[in-house]
A protein has these predicted regions:
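Individual transmembrane alpha-helices with interfacial aromatic-anchor signatures
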Residues: 124-138
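N-terminal signal-anchor transmembrane alpha helix
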Residues: 1-33
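Hydrophobic alpha-helical transmembrane segments
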Residues: 64-83, 87
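Membrane-interface interhelical connector segments
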Residues: 28-61
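Short, charged juxtamembrane terminal tails flanking transmembrane helices
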Residues: 1-6, 149-158
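Membrane-helix interface motif
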Residues: 23-36, 107-117
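Hydrophobic alpha-helical transmembrane segments of integral membrane proteins
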Residues: 86-123
Length: 158
């Protein structure tokens, strides 16, 4: 039986993932206002969740200004979905599912709109893309664990 809290936590996390980096990082407002295609706007908003490069941050090639918005947005998304789904295990599952589904939606919409995905996964961009995915997963897992711990254990009803 599927828990309605888990499904609701994942859905709310996915919905908030469209807007959280937009609110945490105001430089994307100009990019979004320039775009006329709604599909491009959605891709920019979802792709902003994966812009922070965790690998470059620890190798010393990134500054803290780019660090905070994307990681805070991932932690907030994970925290929100973990709190709604209630429980440590369910919070971890919900926050992981949110980031995985966001990544899949981002890739699918990028293919539909005709973006060049090969540029993201080759050469110098490969490290940035993998670092962005890892940072989003790490932030969501931290947020999901915090949300699951704070919300308390899940009550099993039989």
């Amino acid at each position: 039986m599927v828990s309605y809290r888990l499904v609701l936590g994942v859905l709310v996390g996915i919905i908030f993932s469209f807007f959280t980096v937009y609110f945490f990082n105001m430089e994307y407002i100009e990019i979004i206002n320039v775009q006329t295609d709604i599909l491009k706007v959605i891709i920019i908003q979802l792709g902003a969740n994966f812009k922070f490069d965790l690998i470059a941050f620890f190798t010393g090639t990134l500054n803290i200004v780019d660090f905070a918005p994307q990681l805070l947005a991932s932690i907030f998304i994970g925290f929100l979905s973990g709190t709604i789904s209630k429980g440590l295990k369910r919070g971890l599952i919900a926050s992981s599912l949110v980031i995985i589904i966001d990544f899949l939606i981002w890739m699918l919409l990028s293919v539909i709109s005709g973006e060049d995905l090969m540029a993201l996964f080759q050469g110098a961009q490969l490290s940035g893309t993998i670092g962005g995915i890892l940072s989003a997963i790490l932030g969501a897992i931290i947020g999901g664990l915090l949300g699951g711990i704070i919300s308390g254990p899940y009550e099993e009803v039989y």
